[in-house]
Regions:
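A short glycine-rich beta-strand->turn/loop micro-motif centered on a GG-aromatic cluster
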Residues: 96-100, 116-132
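Short acidic/polar active-site loop segments enriched in Thr and Asp
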Residues: 7, 93, 119
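Active-site alpha/beta core segments
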Residues: 1-90
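Anion (oxyanion) recognition and catalysis
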Residues: 2-3, 114, 143
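Generic beta-sheet signal
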Residues: 11, 123-125, 152
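Short acidic-hydrophobic, aromatic-tinged amphipathic segments that line or gate anion-handling sites
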Residues: 70, 147-158
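Active-site-proximal loop->helix
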Residues: 131-143
Length: 159
């Protein structure tokens, strides 16, 4: 995608110290907060190398001037960040989704982007999940919600 000039948009997931004071939340959300997943002390802190908030080392070479890192989402979807705004301001109407949690974050991003009027395709083999059942559930839902669900190889072939 980068080689063909496509922009990459990243919707990061960060929790800050002040988020530990939330008065309620779902079980998955509480697990993430309790385990300090995606944790940074505050918005102005550099990401600690190797922390849950850091980018995977193999992907870091792709972070460049054609990579737009949105403001962070907090729970699962992009409703609390500026992903849709960034996509629209860059003239994007079609999105190819990939990500680490198919049945929660990828699914939530898919649904919100579709509801916001974007064409959304999912690279199914570029998503992960906490177990096969969760992955299978996500793939089933992608088939109902996404414009298309396909392999990464098919995505690259069609770019």
């Amino acid at each position: 995608a980068k080689a063909k000039g496509y922009k990459i948009f990243i919707s990061p997931h960060y929790f800050y110290d002040h988020d530990q004071n939330w008065k309620f939340g779902g079980q998955g959300e509480q697990m993430m907060l309790n385990n300090k997943m995606f944790h940074r002390e505050h918005q102005y802190q550099e990401t600690v190398k190797g922390s849950g908030a850091d980018f995977v080392e193999e992907l870091k070479p792709y972070l460049d001037e054609n990579t737009i890192i949105t403001s962070p989402h907090k729970i699962f979807g992009p409703e609390s960040n500026d992903l849709a705004l960034q996509l629209r301001k860059n003239g994007i109407d079609t999105v190819i989704l990939a990500g680490m949690n198919a049945n929660l974050c990828v699914d939530s991003h898919l649904r919100e982007l579709v509801e916001s009027g974007f064409h959304v395709h999912v690279a199914a083999d570029a998503t992960g999940a906490p177990g096969q059942e969760a992955y299978d559930a996500a793939i089933t839902n992608f088939g109902f919600v996404a414009d298309r669900t396909m392999s990464t190889a098919k995505v690259l072939e069609e770019l």
